[in-house]
Amino acid sequence: MAMEQLLELLQDNAQLTPAQLAVMVGKEEGEVKKAIARYEKEGVIKGYHALINWERTESQKAAALIELRVTPKKDTGFDEIAGRIMNFSEVESVYLMSGGFDLAVTVVGRTMQDIAMFVAKRLSTIDGVLSTATHFVLTKFKDGGVVFNS
């Protein structure tokens, strides 16, 4: 079975049933179920989630991309700092980057003020964090491959 094709279909729409996926990839439903179970066990498939357009609800949220310059640790490099950052509930993603900063962190909070306080009191105080630059999301046009229409 073409692993890439099955994974791309699931990435685009995780609600497809194994029966639907089997038709789309030209395989038996049982083969597809086994492949999905194997991908989940091996950590290829890391999870399933709903992509919410919070602007269409009564409880809007604020989001930000935060650039961090950090000093890597001698034995663990960037992994230790990234690991500490990942554990905050406000953090949605952490990326090691090339270019003018080291880590890119996406954060969600109830308000911009909540995010600002998170950066000031929790993120910037981590040992090894040299500087932060916070960029608030003003409008989300596309996320996770899905177009958001206002």
Description of each model-found segment:
Residues 1-150:
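A compositional/biophysical signature of low hydrophobicity enriched in polar/charged and small residues
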